[in-house]
Amino acid sequence: MRHRKQGRKFGRTSSHRKAMFKNMSASLINHELIKTTLPKAKELRAIVEPLVTLAKREHKLRQELDTNSNEFKAQSVALRRQAFDFLRNKAAVTKLFEEFGARYAERAGGYTRILKCGYRFGDKAPMAFIELVDRPQVEEAADEE
């Protein structure tokens, strides 16, 4: 029976599933918006939100402690290593801690938004955009006359 089993399998081995979500997490952090299937987006939300919370904790430490103190450095490195242990992407970890910690400092959770966007052409799988809320809008160069 499947009682109290968390997570979805997606027809993949556990190592394939872990690798897929590590890559998707790094992509979401780097691009702040990705398109994927709805079940994957729902599962990804549960993975990315704790990573943003790590960045918020480091931002809070940065405000409370002197950034040159050994206590701050030790805790900051520990938090970054926890994030890197999952992501395995230096650029994503840097962006996570440098941008998202400050951006979501006042938000108490709910850092991602899932927007349904129809069905995939080939197999009618439900598709969705998953994005980080409060992301800066990219201004498109539109010629208005």
Swiss-Prot record:
Keyword field: Ribonucleoprotein, Ribosomal protein
Signal peptide start-end: none
UniProt cross-references to PANTHER family, sorted A to Z: LARGE RIBOSOMAL SUBUNIT PROTEIN BL17M (PTHR14413:SF16), RIBOSOMAL PROTEIN L17 (PTHR14413)
Family named by the database record: Belongs to the bacterial ribosomal protein bL17 family.
GO molecular function, one term: structural constituent of ribosome
A GO CC term assigned to this protein in UniProt: cytosolic large ribosomal subunit
Protein name, as recorded: Large ribosomal subunit protein bL17
Pfam families: Ribosomal_L17
One example of a Gene Ontology biological process annotation: translation
Keyword Glycoprotein set for record: no
HAMAP family: Ribosomal_bL17 (MF_01368)
Subunit structure: Part of the 50S ribosomal subunit. Contacts protein L32.
InterPro entries: Ribosomal_bL17, Ribosomal_bL17_CS, Ribosomal_bL17_sf
Keyword Ribosomal protein appears in the UniProt entry: yes
